Each structure stands twice: as structure tokens, then as C-alpha cells.
Amino acid sequence: MITGIVLAAGTSSRFGRTKQLLELDHKPFVQHAVDAAADGSLEEVIVVLGHDAAAVEKALRGARTVLNPAFAEGQSTSLLAGLDAADPESEAAVVLLADQPRITADHVRALVEAFRVRRSLIVRLRFRDGPGPALLSRDVWEEVRKLTGDTGAREIVAAHPEWVEEIAVDEEVPLDVDEATDLHRLR
């Protein structure tokens, strides 16, 4: 079993309103991430909520939610909340961000297929202009639990490049929507 963890707890401070609820193609950003996970052959999808949790949860379908009461302490706390909520039988987790609505089921499937074939500790998409979502084997979750503050698994990737298998994707990184100008470029 592989779990999808959608990080959707952030305050959207640079954007000024809850990004997770912004719509693209008549669907909230957070639902795009859930659909990519579910359609990408992940058996379990967990959305980690924090800021504006009730409104984000109301906009969701097809995912289990977990509340991160420490979301203001940074992304690492949401990642840990997602890992803690994962099924004990889960052998890996694909981590998706709620503000990247152009990540697709095909992207998720590429991570899963690479993991199933080579059993790498970390599998990460490498777009033409930078890194994308990653799959974290359960074997590295204890290392992930050491993270603090507003950081994700990038610190572990930087510290242990030998653990990482990168899957080349011949496209630009799907836009991470942080500011209003990003939203206009996305549409």
C-alpha cells in the first residue's frame, strides 16, 4: 500500500486568502491534488488540514482528513501529521502540495512505478526547471520525523542524495501558486 499525503494546512500568507479553495477548471486546488493521488493508483489519500480547516474539508471528497493543530509551526509538522495518520501497512507516501493543481495522476503513477520496480528510498520527479513531488519510502520516515519548522523533505534529499532516484519529466514544473500573479499565469 502506498499513501498519498496532501499538505493543505498552510495559511496562504503571501496570497492573502485560502489557496486550497481557489478553483481551476471549476474544482478547488486541494481537490486537484486529491484526484491526482486517487487516480494515480494510491490506495489511501490523507489531506492534512490546519488553517481554515472546516472550509477546506467541506470542499473535499474522496479523502480522509487529519487536523494538524501545529500547522503554524511550518510544513514539517503537516508532513509528520500525514505520516502519523498513514495506514500501518503503508510502505511509502507520495507527498503532494495543495497549491500545485497541475500535478497529475500520471506524475503520481511515475513515482509509484519507479518505487515498485527499484525500491528506492526516495523517488522524486525532476522537471526541466526543478524538482517536483516526491515519494518517501517508510524506511526514511524516521529521518523525516527529525525535520522541524517550515521545511519539507528537501533537507533530507540534500543531505542524502544517494537515497534519491530522480525521474526526468520533460515539462516545466507545474506552477506552485503563492501569489496572485501565479494564479493569473496558471489560468
Predicted features and spans:
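Conserved alpha/beta core of the MobA/IspD/sugar-nucleotide pyrophosphorylase nucleotidyltransferase superfamily
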Residues: 1, 146-187
